[in-house]
Amino acid sequence: MYITIHLKKGIPAIFGMALVVVCLSGKALGAITISIDYSLDSTGFFSDGDGAAKKAALEAARDVFEGIISDSIAAITPGGANTWNATGYHPGTGASGTLATDLSVAADTLIIYAGGRALSGSNLAQGGPGGWSGSGTVGFVDNLYNRGESGITNGSAVELGTQTDFAPWGGTITFDNDDVAWHYDHTTSVDAGKFDFYTAALHELVHAIGFGTSNSWDDLVSSGTFTGSQSNTSNGGSNVSLYSADGGTTYGHWVSGTTSVRLSDGASQETAMDPDVTAGTRKYLTNLDAMGLADIGWQLNITAVPEPSTWALMSGIALLGFGAVRRYRLNPLTCKSSQ
């Protein structure tokens, strides 16, 4: 499944009531660990001269989710007859297939393989959750499906009924490495005409953990709107209109121009998960973005959201930005593979 995101100038309007959250570092109690794995970065995107800044920006985006997700998910522990393959899109080649065999995944941990490659057309980045194939005891295979989450029902190698949770082993994220004017330093203002790497990383990570890419998301989509109760409340009591890049077959983003309030300071901002981003600007996670994650099953503890250290410097930048319109396509592989 492909999801296209358009990057263009947006003018966010004041929306809803501000939710002010104290900006502290550290993880939420019982937090999920998101382990960024660069071992499949076959093009060396994260090991060139800008590699340290790229990693710092990606890991700062990762820290946001480690700071608010308080879920608990079971470990994946292969051994003996219990064997499995983690599948997905290789971040360095784009090939779809096995990424790792008999990968051990610790409890409360997601693994995100990150890399870079030349993406076709005007694509900036791609990301999404991984799939799997496996065999073994009933308990082992069930755990590949649900990692102990009761809201994911399955049987005979197919998922059954309405899904209210999501718990993948992890996923992949890839950034264009040949013709994008990236701004890598997440601690400084975004240069005019450049695309903010932190913003792209934040957006892709949300997709990697199920936003627009999971069965529990799909089960809440109706007539071009998202019907999740917490998103509805965050959106002033209305279902959230969605954007489709393929004429209504799939919906993976809030509709263009959707606004909410930043978790970091309660200021109004265009959501991180609408399809529009402007060169020269930075986006932060908003309340509506977070409620989308809550509705697909993630337990959240929104008391502390770490953002780049200079978010205050950037607070007036989100409405600015100059440069050509740019589109990028996400390439998530949903966790629906059978044994």
Task: Describe each region flagged by the PLM.
Residues 2-15, 309:
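Bacterial N-terminal signal peptides that target proteins for export
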